[in-house]
């Protein structure tokens, strides 16, 4: 594939999603080029990201369900032992970092950690295998293979990472209102960090406090999602650049980078999970 097109085309092809959306003048369709995908705008759907994220979510649920169903009280098998270690690891972090009373946080944290880890893990797949297979399938169906895009790492798509982070943001708002009441939540946004005993001064400070607190609040999901996206996108881009090099250089660079990347994909899943726990813990605290 790399020999048939330019390096620029190769990189652009690997960084373009399989996109379905409304193209002005042509109606609803699958994008044939990166330019068409961009012109489809915000409402376009990245079909590959949806397919892989949902598919890996099903794999996660099925795997844990099967292990739980076959779990024994005696000496556990290797898979059961690994699952138990993950569950205990997440549960320990929740107990140490979450000060609220909700029983939802531990299973939520476990879901976030394992799901993101599985999505990140796709970055270790050989860069061309699945996309080239998708191109061959597309060609067999009568499509131009160069117009077939198929990314396999959902966390390199900001729509996925920001979608997860804003779901966490919705939980932050929910727990803030649940624990503090609507009045307490509004007061937290308008009466801090600056306060005054004089009623007039307090009213004057309300918009200033709101701007500062709102920026702090909205920065949480944005930074949470973009941090995961940025790290994974950069990792994928490096793999793409390595794939453009001569074969003997590819092995010399890809193996150590893949080994190092194992740390990155695990760390990014852990960071997302921990920040979620911390944010929800702060939202559950009744004192500012």
UniProtKB/Swiss-Prot annotation:
Gene Ontology CC terms, in alphabetical order: plasma membrane; proton-transporting ATP synthase complex
Pfam families per UniProt: ATP-synt_A (PF00119)
Alphabetized UniProt keyword annotations: ATP synthesis, Cell inner membrane, Cell membrane, CF(0), Hydrogen ion transport, Ion transport, Membrane, Transmembrane, Transmembrane helix, Transport
UniProt cross-references to PROSITE patterns, sorted A to Z: ATPASE_A
Gene3D superfamilies documented for this protein: ATP synthase, F0 complex, subunit A (1.20.120.220)
InterPro entries: ATP_syn_F0_a_bact/chloroplast, ATP_synth_F0_asu, ATP_synth_F0_asu_AS, F0_ATP_A_sf
GO BP: proton motive force-driven plasma membrane ATP synthesis
Highest rank taxon of the organism: Bacteria
CDD domains referenced in this protein's UniProt entry, alphabetically: ATP-synt_Fo_a_6
Localization terms from the record: Cell inner membrane
UniProt-recorded Gene Ontology molecular function terms: proton-transporting ATP synthase activity, rotational mechanism
Transmembrane segments: 47-67, 104-124, 157-177, 199-219, 237-257, 258-278
Membrane-protein topology: Multi-pass membrane protein
Keyword flag Transmembrane helix: yes
UniProt function note: Key component of the proton channel; it plays a direct role in the translocation of protons across the membrane.
HAMAP family associated with the record: ATP_synth_a_bact (MF_01393)
Family, similarity comment: Belongs to the ATPase A chain family.
Binding partners and assembly: F-type ATPases have 2 components, CF(1) - the catalytic core - and CF(0) - the membrane proton channel. CF(1) has five subunits: alpha(3), beta(3), gamma(1), delta(1), epsilon(1). CF(0) has three main subunits: a(1), b(2) and c(9-12). The alpha and beta chains form an alternating ring which encloses part of the gamma chain. CF(1) is attached to CF(0) by a central stalk formed by the gamma and epsilon chains, while a peripheral stalk is formed by the delta and b chains.
NCBIfam families recorded: ATP_synt_6_or_A (TIGR01131), PRK05815.1-1 (NF004477)
Record-given protein name: ATP synthase subunit a
Organism field: Psychrobacter sp. (strain PRwf-1)
């Amino acid at each position: 594939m790399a020999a048939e097109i330019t390096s620029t085309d190769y990189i652009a092809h690997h960084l373009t999603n399989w996109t379905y959306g409304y193209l002005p003048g042509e109606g609803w369709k699958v994008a044939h080029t990166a330019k068409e995908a961009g012109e489809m705008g915000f409402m376009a759907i990245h079909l590959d990201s949806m397919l892989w994220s949902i598919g890996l979510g099903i794999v996660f649920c099925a795997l844990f369900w099967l292990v739980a169903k076959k779990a024994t009280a005696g000496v556990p098998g290797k898979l059961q032992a690994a699952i138990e270690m993950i569950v205990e690891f997440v549960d320990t972090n929740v107990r140490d970092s979450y000060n609220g009373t909700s029983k939802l946080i531990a299973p939520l944290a476990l879901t976030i950690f394992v799901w993101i880890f599985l999505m990140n893990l796709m970055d270790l797949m050989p860069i061309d295998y699945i996309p080239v297979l998708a191109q061959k399938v597309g060609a067999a169906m009568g499509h131009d293979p160069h117009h077939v895009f198929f990314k396999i790492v959902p966390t390199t798509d900001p729509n996925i990472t920001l979608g997860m982070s804003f779901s966490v943001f919705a939980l932050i708002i929910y727990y803030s209102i649940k624990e503090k009441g609507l009045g307490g939540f509004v007061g937290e946004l308008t009466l801090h960090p600056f306060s005054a005993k004089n009623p007039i001064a307090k009213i004057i400070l309300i918009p200033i406090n709101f701007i500062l607190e709102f920026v702090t609040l909205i920065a949480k999901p944005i930074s949470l999602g973009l941090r995961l996206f940025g790290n994974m996108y950069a990792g994928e881009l490096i793999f793409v650049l390595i794939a453009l090099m001569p074969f003997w250089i590819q092995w010399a660079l890809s193996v150590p980078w893949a080994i190092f990347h194992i740390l990155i994909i695990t760390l990014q899943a852990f960071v997302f999970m921990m920040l979620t726990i911390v944010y929800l813990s702060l939202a559950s605290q009744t004192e500012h």
